[in-house]
């Protein structure tokens, strides 16, 4: 018989493998991405102190009015730009990118590219 592939468990296994290799510091925090079917979330995390420094998502009041659908590439670009602007306000220029087990394509890549264009280096 065929084994059913558990996509969520597979992604979480990849996520833990990635998480063991990268870590965020106060000078260079980790940009963690989470995507659902309807929204996308990004946050800059300092793993040394265990705190979130900056966050942005499609459910933020500032972005929700300008985005019709939170689950598409345009919304991911808006979140990437917003997180980069908020990071710049806090004096953060360099980050470590954590794709959280998702393939680097589509919404995840769009968010990363928009953050790079807005001035974050990784």
Curated annotation (Swiss-Prot):
Keywords: Ribonucleoprotein, Ribosomal protein, RNA-binding, rRNA-binding. It comes from Fusobacterium nucleatum subsp. nucleatum (strain ATCC 25586 / DSM 15643 / BCRC 10681 / CIP 101130 / JCM 8532 / KCTC 2640 / LMG 13131 / VPI 4355). Part of the 50S ribosomal subunit; part of the 5S rRNA/L5/L18/L25 subcomplex. Contacts the 5S and 23S rRNAs. The gene is rplR. The keyword 4Fe-4S does not apply. GO terms for molecular function: 5S rRNA binding; structural constituent of ribosome. It comes from the Bacteria. This is Large ribosomal subunit protein uL18. Residues 1-29 are annotated as: Disordered. This is one of the proteins that bind and probably mediate the attachment of the 5S RNA into the large ribosomal subunit, where it forms part of the central protuberance. Belongs to the universal ribosomal protein uL18 family. GO terms for biological process: translation. Residues 1-16 have a biased composition (Basic residues). InterPro entries: Ribosomal_uL18_bac-type, Ribosomal_uL18_bac/euk. Pfam families: Ribosomal_L18p. One of its GO terms (cellular component) is cytosolic large ribosomal subunit.
